[in-house]
Amino acid sequence: MVNEFEKLQSGKLLLASANLLESNFKRTVLIICEHNESGSLGFILNRPMEFKVCEAVAGFEEIEEPLHMGGPVQVDTVHFLHSRGDIIDGATEIFPGLFWGGDKNQVSFLLNTGVMQPSEIRFFLGYSGWSAGQLEEEFEIGSWYIAEASRDVIFSDAYERMWSRSVRSKGGEYQIVANAPELPGLN
């Protein structure tokens, strides 16, 4: 049987287990964009902020979409995932149809001219990062699950249900976990 951690690679979803109660990651869904011997990097998908992109990111004054908390690392940096690697220079493909980064000025131009739609991009403040071996240790103590990613999940605005739907999609015993109350002691 393959160890769950051995399935981890760029383009997979990282789901906080029900045991992970740390506030930065409780019931989060992350997309892993980089995973190698040096560590891992990803973005939290289900933590929209109260700020809109137009209020916080220079050059994107027309974008009324929410800015997302990508994670607790370098929260003074802005990152983006998008589906238009075919027209954005410097983008890194995460899986077919999903790209990370690229030329920010080009993205601004494409959005402002309507060539690219806001629904094709998601902006993040900061990122989630793990040093070499750190994420593996967290797996060993049961902090994370791995699931398949899709563009539908990445660009979904069903933030409240994203974690339970993603956990439930794993099937079997995970369906019970997905339905567990957030604070079982209050039942």
UniProtKB/Swiss-Prot annotation:
<dbReference type="InterPro" id="IPR003774">
    <property type="entry name" value="AlgH-like"/>
</dbReference>
<dbReference type="GO" id="GO:0005829">
    <property type="term" value="C:cytosol"/>
</dbReference>
<protein>
    <recommendedName>
        <fullName>UPF0301 protein Cpha266_0885</fullName>
    </recommendedName>
</protein>
<comment type="similarity">
    <text>Belongs to the UPF0301 (AlgH) family.</text>
</comment>
<dbReference type="Pfam" id="PF02622">
    <property type="entry name" value="DUF179"/>
</dbReference>
